[in-house]
Amino acid sequence: MQYAKISGTGSYLPANRVSNDDLAQKVDTSDEWITARTGIKFRHIAAENEKTSDLAAEAARRALADAKLNINDIDLIIVATATPDMQFPSTATIVQQKLGITNGCPAFDVQAVCAGFMYALTTANAYIKSGMAKNALVIGAETFSRIVDWNDRTTCVLFGDGAGAVVLSASDKPGIIHSKLKADGNYLKLLNVPGQIACGKVSGSPYISMDGPGVFKFAVKMLSKIADDVIEEAGYTAEQIDWIVPHQANRRIIESTAKHLGLSMDKVVLTVQDHGNTSAASIPLALDAGIRSGQIKRGQNLLLEGIGGGFAWGAVLLQY
């Protein structure tokens, strides 16, 4: 049986590390307030000349090195991002150019905000299982600092920039076991960026608009359900999960999912305190951190899950 297995991971964080105390000098907030409600202590912010594609390309280089593959071994590139370099072309094609990949492989973006990496990974899995690709580069990359209102203390404290990447390779050994994606556009008012470009003009606010309590309530409910669904549909039990690698948005949401599954927080890869919410980048960033720290080991079962504006959400059960 053909599987898609992670053969390499990599990540990149901008050099500028911003603490809660740093933000408290700019808006009416405090380290205690932010930490108690979110678990976030730090976030990284891209330099003025750093684009989403720059972060993505560096994470990709590290993933390729980890997989011990050459650039032209890659035959599919998918970038999950809600903050592309430009309206078009896709950030994936820009990354393709920056990496020097010249084999003409397909490259495209996926936009499902914080669930984007789940959507991208599931798409790459389908390519590999169908025989359409052998080595896929799957990247989550964001520069959310560009769409945050730095005068709004309810949102500016939450987000950070970064990129994470995996190389997904064809294998006869188990890799991605099961995945499930969901969406419901009826909740778009809870979390969105209302601004839009039309006829050369920008209309509406270009910054994140969020109903925090509404997002929290929906996320807790849907993440618990999709985690149950993926585990059950795969014929597994929660006890067989070695690590949860969740979207790193809010520690309380993460704790709720772990509690629902009956799993200790000792089985959760947690990076929200260091990265903040990096949207589509958060899961691959956490995955790479867990692997490089020695927490995650080959052969272990991982549950990846996340939810983003739309709403769009998803979960992937895989063997590393």
Curated annotation (Swiss-Prot):
What Enzyme Commission number(s) apply to this enzyme? 2.3.1.180
GO MF entries: 3-oxoacyl-[acyl-carrier-protein] synthase activity; beta-ketoacyl-acyl-carrier-protein synthase III activity
Q: Does the keyword Lipid metabolism apply?
A: yes
The organism named in the record is Neisseria gonorrhoeae (strain ATCC 700825 / FA 1090)
- Gene Ontology cellular-component annotations: cytoplasm
Predominant localisation class = cytoplasm
Locate the transmembrane regions by residue number. none
According to its UniProt record, which residues of this chain constitute the active site?
A: C114, H247, N277
Q: Does the keyword Acyltransferase apply?
A: yes
Q: What is this protein called?
A: Beta-ketoacyl-[acyl-carrier-protein] synthase III
What protein family is recorded? Belongs to the thiolase-like superfamily. FabH family.
Catalytic activity entry: malonyl-[ACP] + acetyl-CoA + H(+) = 3-oxobutanoyl-[ACP] + CO2 + CoA
Query: Where in this protein does the record put region ACP-binding?
Result: 248-252
Q: In which pathway does it act?
A: Lipid metabolism; fatty acid biosynthesis
According to its UniProt entry, the function of this protein is described as: Catalyzes the condensation reaction of fatty acid synthesis by the addition to an acyl acceptor of two carbons from malonyl-ACP. Catalyzes the first condensation reaction which initiates fatty acid synthesis and may therefore play a role in governing the total rate of fatty acid production. Possesses both acetoacetyl-ACP synthase and acetyl transacylase activities. Its substrate specificity determines the biosynthesis of branched-chain and/or straight-chain of fatty acids.
Task: Quote any Pfam family the record assigns.
Answer: ACP_syn_III_C
Domain notes from UniProt: The last Arg residue of the ACP-binding site is essential for the weak association between ACP/AcpP and FabH.
Q: Where in the cell is it found?
A: Cytoplasm
Subunit text: Homodimer.
